[in-house]
């Protein structure tokens, strides 16, 4: 249930801040959002998969923490990221 290498590379390419950036909050949030979207499709057909649901909740909470951190550090970067990902924050 993970993303393939091409998808990850595309996300990193789109949200990175400099050519060697792979760990900025923007990249991490974008990767987590892609994994969350992937899992939401899985739950449409596997409603009783509680083990994966726990992992989903951990990812959602990790994304929330990263977004809170980004909001406290740089409000403009936070707004740009939320609008580009289409999150409800």
From Swiss-Prot:
PROSITE patterns linked? RIBOSOMAL_S15 (PS00362)
Q: What Gene3D superfamilies does the record point to?
A: 6.10.250.3130, S15/NS1, RNA-binding (1.10.287.10)
Q: State the Gene Ontology BP annotations.
A: translation
Q: Name one GO molecular function term.
A: rRNA binding
What are the protein's UniProt keywords? Ribonucleoprotein, Ribosomal protein, RNA-binding, rRNA-binding
Which GO CC annotations does the UniProt entry carry? Answer: cytosolic small ribosomal subunit
The UniProt record lists the keyword RNA-binding: yes
Question: From what superkingdom does this record's organism come?
Answer: Bacteria
- Name any one Pfam family assigned in the record: Ribosomal_S15
**Region annotation Disordered: where it falls in the sequence:** 1-24
- What are the Basic and acidic residues biased-composition ranges? 11-20
Q: How does it assemble?
A: Part of the 30S ribosomal subunit. Forms a bridge to the 50S subunit in the 70S ribosome, contacting the 23S rRNA.
What role does it play?
A: One of the primary rRNA binding proteins, it binds directly to 16S rRNA where it helps nucleate assembly of the platform of the 30S subunit by binding and bridging several RNA helices of the 16S rRNA. Forms an intersubunit bridge (bridge B4) with the 23S rRNA of the 50S subunit in the ribosome.
Family the entry assigns: Belongs to the universal ribosomal protein uS15 family.
PANTHER family membership: RIBOSOMAL PROTEIN S15, BACTERIAL AND ORGANELLAR, SMALL RIBOSOMAL SUBUNIT PROTEIN US15M
Q: What is this protein called?
A: Small ribosomal subunit protein uS15
- The record lists the organism as Thioalkalivibrio sulfidiphilus (strain HL-EbGR7)
């Amino acid at each position: 249930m993970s993303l393939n290498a091409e998808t990850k590379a595309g996300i990193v390419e789109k949200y990175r801040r400099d050519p060697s950036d792979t760990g900025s909050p923007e990249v991490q949030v974008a990767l987590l959002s892609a994994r969350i979207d992937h899992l939401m499709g899985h739950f449409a057909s596997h409603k009783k998969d509680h083990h994966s649901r726990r992992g989903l909740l951990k990812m959602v909470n990790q994304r929330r923490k990263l977004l809170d951190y980004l909001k406290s550090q740089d409000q403009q970067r936070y707004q740009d990221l939320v609008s580009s990902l289409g999150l409800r924050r």
